[in-house]
């Protein structure tokens, strides 16, 4: 998409009111049939869709243009009928030119798959329009791609099983149409943050769906639970991966948004989050030795609690190009955390802390931090995000992640932050005081911390350094070391992905 991505919502709303719709579409709105039918005038004009076979990593090298019924360009550019064939499909544009991400993706594919055919589907004339008109054109472009694939199938040794359609934003739904219209079944479709407006809640044949290819994997990076979402929120593939919950991406955060508003560059922040899906896919191509893993979970909140770090029964998978086919699943939601830039990989840890108290302190809201010490490196001080509340005399589960590979964990420092002068923390202190007026001294006891690595699936148990001292209070810390019987490997089936 172009730098004018936020105008998408404006143009869409204008279209709805202009068409006489009493209520503009919303995130859960149904799709009107008329918005997906090509206009009558479009049937009289030959669709402007070109297929550019890129034969070099150099973006200045034009390559060859393929057209149905003309075999000479296939020979001139040495089209390999037995190799993998990638079709890259861009999305809506307000600039009318290719974005930089496209050239990076072409280069990354050539680097990873040297013998592959990389075809850029150029539908800029049909995409460089009002968003609603571009949506109407997606079906036309999908038909054009299907015709190209049907023609290629007439050639010896060409197989649809080797075809991988990669669609960004609106291009993801174009890929879905192509997979639906082609004679046969495409091997794979990857949707990179498929567009949301006019597709959220749509019928299965009017958007990208698991039926469009043998394997459909989707990355969601710009979804929102409120208002209009640029990317689609609902799962639309066999596996749907939501990095960082699918909304606020590291490096494109609220502080950047506020700063961009001040300087009038809000579109860059929107573009950053929407386009992050592309860069995650490129990262999976060029940083093959640093794969990122996602974990199946019912929702983002459960993942934030650290509950969903299992690899049993296909519950984890690589993201991007390295994703393993899981044809038996549909609309499987998976989550992970990432860094702010390449390589995006982080290391996930589930921490189980049994908190008990000898005093009836009522409800408390402690602020905990941990520091992990390993054989390779030590982590920074990491916050323990409390999604709901701390349960006393119960086991509480947390998710922490590090940007470095710490190696084997050796010890853990747990810190209970003391009172600060922020209004929020003062309010927390006041509420805690009101909840337990007869027990002004706040103290919790923790004997052990159990840790599970998402990437290796290994488990460790850590005990307090001093068995006689298990108490922690605001402004204090506790140290934990690996218990004598602490190192154990979970006795379960092997992970379904090749873990490093």
From Swiss-Prot:
Protein residues bound to heparin: 325-337
The EC number(s) this enzyme carries: 3.1.1.3, 3.1.1.32
Listed GO biological process terms: cholesterol homeostasis; fatty acid biosynthetic process; high-density lipoprotein particle remodeling; lipid metabolic process; phospholipid catabolic process; phospholipid homeostasis; positive regulation of cholesterol transport; positive regulation of high-density lipoprotein particle clearance
Domain PLAT stretches: 347-482
SMART domains: LH2
Active site residues per record: 169, 193, 274
Subunit field text: Head to tail homodimer.
Function per UniProt: Exerts both phospholipase and triglyceride lipase activities. More active as a phospholipase than a triglyceride lipase. Hydrolyzes triglycerides, both with short-chain fatty acyl groups (tributyrin) and long-chain fatty acyl groups (triolein) with similar levels of activity toward both types of substrates. Hydrolyzes high density lipoproteins (HDL) more efficiently than other lipoproteins.
Family statement: Belongs to the AB hydrolase superfamily. Lipase family.
Protein name stated in the entry: Endothelial lipase
The organism of origin for this protein: Homo sapiens (Human)
């Amino acid at each position: 998409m172009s730098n004018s991505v936020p105008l998408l919502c404006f143009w869409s709303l204008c279209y709805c009111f202009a068409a006489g719709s009493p209520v503009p579409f919303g995130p859960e709105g149904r799709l009107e049939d008329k918005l997906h039918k090509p206009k009558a005038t479009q049937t009289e004009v030959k669709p402007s869709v070109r297929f550019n076979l890129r034969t070099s990593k150099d973006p200045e090298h034009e390559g060859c243009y393929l057209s149905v019924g003309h075999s000479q360009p296939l020979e001139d550019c040495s089209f390999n009928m037995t190799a993998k064939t990638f079709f890259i499909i861009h999305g809506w544009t307000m600039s009318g030119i290719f974005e930089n991400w496209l050239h990076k993706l072409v280069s990354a594919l050539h680097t990873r798959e040297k013998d592959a055919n990389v075809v850029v589907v150029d539908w800029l004339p049909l995409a460089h329009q009002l968003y609603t008109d571009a949506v109407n054109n997606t079906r036309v472009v999908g038909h054009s791609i299907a015709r190209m694939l049907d023609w290629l199938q007439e050639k010896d040794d060409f197989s649809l099983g080797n075809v991988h359609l990669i669609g960004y934003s609106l291009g993801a739904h174009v890929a879905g149409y192509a997979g639906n219209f082609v004679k046969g079944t495409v091997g794979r479709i990857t949707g990179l943050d498929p567009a949301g407006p006019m597709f959220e809640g749509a019928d299965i044949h009017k958007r990208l769906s698991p039926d469009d290819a043998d394997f459909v994997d989707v990355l969601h990076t710009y979804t929102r639970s409120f208002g209009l979402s640029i990317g689609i929120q609902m799962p639309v593939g066999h596996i749907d991966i939501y990095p960082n919950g699918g909304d606020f991406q590291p490096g494109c955060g609220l502080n950047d948004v506020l700063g961009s508003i001040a300087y009038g560059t809000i579109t860059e922040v929107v573009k950053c989050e929407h386009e992050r899906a592309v860069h995650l896919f490129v990262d999976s191509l060029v940083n093959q030795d640093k794969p990122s893993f996602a974990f199946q979970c019912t929702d983002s909140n459960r993942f934030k609690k650290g509950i969903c770090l299992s690899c049993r029964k296909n519950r984890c998978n690589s993201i991007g190009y390295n994703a393993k086919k899981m044809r038996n699943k549909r609309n499987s939601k998976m989550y992970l955390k990432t860094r702010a830039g390449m390589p995006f990989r982080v290391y996930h840890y589930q921490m189980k802390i049994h908190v008990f108290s000898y005093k009836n302190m009522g409800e408390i809201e402690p602020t905990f931090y941990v520091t992990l010490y390993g054989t390779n490196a030590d982590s920074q001080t990491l916050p323990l995000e409390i999604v709901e509340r701390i349960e006393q005399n119960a086991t509480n589960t947390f998710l922490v992640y590090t940007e470095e590979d710490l190696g084997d964990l050796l010890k853990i420092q747990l810190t209970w932050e003391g009172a600060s002068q922020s209004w929020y923390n003062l309010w927390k202190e006041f509420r805690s005081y009101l909840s337990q007026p007869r027990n002004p001294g706040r103290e919790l006891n923790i004997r052990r911390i159990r840790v599970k690595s998402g990437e290796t699936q290994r488990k460790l148990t850590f005990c307090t350094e001093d068995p006689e001292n298990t108490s922690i209070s605001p402004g204090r810390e506790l140290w934990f070391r690996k218990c004598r019987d602490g190192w154990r490997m979970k006795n379960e089936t092997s992970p379904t992905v090749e873990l490093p």
